[in-house]
Structure formats: C-alpha cells, structure tokens
Amino acid sequence: MKLSVPGRATGIAAISIAALLTTSAIADAAPARVAAAPDIPVANVKAHLTQLQSIATANGGNRAHGRAGYKASLDYVKARLDAAGFTTAIQQFTSSGRVGYNLIADWPGGDANQVVMAGSHLDSVSSGAGINDNGSGSAAVLEAALTVSRTQYRPTKHLRFAWWGAEELGMVGSRYYVNSLSTANRARISGYLNFDMIGSPNPGYFVYDDNPAIEKTFKDYFTGIGVPTEIETEGDGRSDHAPFKSAGVPVGGLFTGASNSKTAAQAAKWGGTAGTAFDRCYHSSCDTTSNINDTALNRNSDALAYAVWELSK
C-alpha cells in the first residue's frame, strides 16, 4: 500500500492486451461449471511468498519499481500463468525515470462484455522485500488464477487478473492501465477486486465499502465462517482500486491493516494485541516471510476466490 501522494507516469510503450479468445469452441468442450469456489491451499500461497522473498534477497533486498527484483517477480508470476494456459501481456510505462511493468492475464472464455478483474500491486518499497505489502495480495491472486486453471472453471463472465507496478509511487501502474482503456473497454469491466496487505501479523478483517454488491459478497463469505468484519478506512483511496473507482468501475477489496493500532474492541473480536500496529513492519526491512499471519492469509485467500467465483457466475 502506497504512503506517498499519487505521482504521474509517462508511458513510453504499451504492449496491447491480446484480444480475448472466442468462446464457442471452449464452450463445446467445457466441463460443468463448479457450483462454488474451491478452497485455496494457504501452503500454495506461502510457497509463492517464499519465491518472492528469495527474489528480493537475490536482488538487493527489495522488489521495488525499476529494480531487478521487481522484474524478476513479474517474470515468476508470468511464467506460472503462461504454463497454466492464461493469455498474458506486459504493459510498460515509465515513472521517476525508471521503466515499470504491469502484468495482465486473461482466462480464455466468458463474456468479453462482462469482465471481472482481480488485482494487486507486485512492487515493494525500496526498504524491504514487501512480503505482506504486497506479496500477500499478489500471491493470493496468483494462486486464485492457478486454481481457475486447475479446476478448468468456465464462468459466464470473462476473468482477468492483474499485477500492478509502481503502486508505492502512487498507483502509477494501475492508473496507467485504466487511462489506456477506451471508454467502451472500461464499461466492460463489471467489477475490479483489489487485494493489498491481506496477511498482516496482527490482523484485522476489513472490507472496502465502495460497490455494495461486491462489499456484500465479501461480507457474506466472512459471515459464513463466523469472522466479523469492519469497513476499511485506513487505506481508503490509497491502493490500486482508486483509479478504477475514479473511472466509474465498480470496485471492492480486502485489507488486514497497516500502521494503525488495533483497538481493545478489535482485539476482543479478532484476537491479537491491542495497542499494537496491525503490521509493525509496514514499509520496513522486517516485512519478510516471518511477517505473515497464516490464518489471515488463508481466510482472505479463500474470500478472494469466493468473490471471483460468485461475481463471475
């Protein structure tokens, strides 16, 4: 999650997102649509975090915009998606004198006039590996996409997944993507779901209150597992849903807290430590694989998948 005031990016090139594949042949051979989202194994999500940590360690301790660690992170995610049958595209831009990249992955099939997107920023700050901020969201979105492939899910709507660059500089990559879309293509996005910091070590369970239908979908999931939620306010407008919302796209998302302190009332209902930040390692060098609450990561990964399945049916 970004801390600074939004910056401005200048695009130097953009690789056009591949045209959506026609669905007729796929529909003929498609298996029956699954009735509900499958469980997302948290061990798989954590395995992606281990890879992102290794990438940061091998590249100066971070995965920041314009640094080798960011491009290596993007290459890792892209390779997994390509092998799983996604149509991927890299979108290039510049910010602060450095080249940045977005990664877009489309799952073949579904109604191209009704696109459900799930995304997260892949970059870290320069001071650390960014495993909670935002390896957690990036890894969960990746594993949800891979689960779509493993189950050969054939939704009614078209599914698109995204990993954004330079969020920490002010949602630069996601803003560049939104601005690159025609008015017609923006209107085709029926919902954008954002996942930024979903494994905080002293977690809360926060739901964006932007689009009512998306908000209700997430709340329904958490109600079903007996976990109370609160409306997200700490990061309001400070992550990659903001450019989509400004463009009129319905948005929603999940968050487990950053530098704000957990109150006594929150600790009573969620556990954890009152008077301590949700993430004491926010934007710090200690944001490593030891800075993750597995229970929060597991619940939010499953909530992510639930929303993708429910909203794309």
Language-model-detected regions and their locations in the chain:
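A non-catalytic alpha/beta surface segment that caps or lines the substrate-entry region
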Residues: 50, 54-108
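Secretory targeting and sorting signals
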Residues: 1-30
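His/Asp/Glu-rich mid-to-C-terminal helical/loop segments that flank catalytic regions of hydrolases
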Residues: 261-313
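Structural recognition of the beta-strand scaffold that forms the well-ordered cores
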Residues: 45-53, 89-91, 102-106, 115-119, ...
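Extracytoplasmic/secreted proteins, especially bacterial periplasmic and envelope-associated proteins
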Residues: 44-47, 51, 68-88, 136-143, ...
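N-terminal capping segment at the start of a domain
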Residues: 32-68, 123-124, 193, 197-200, ...
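Metal-dependent peptidase/peptidase-like ectodomains
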Residues: 164-263
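Alpha-helical metal-binding/catalytic segments enriched in His/Glu/Asp
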Residues: 105, 118-171, 304
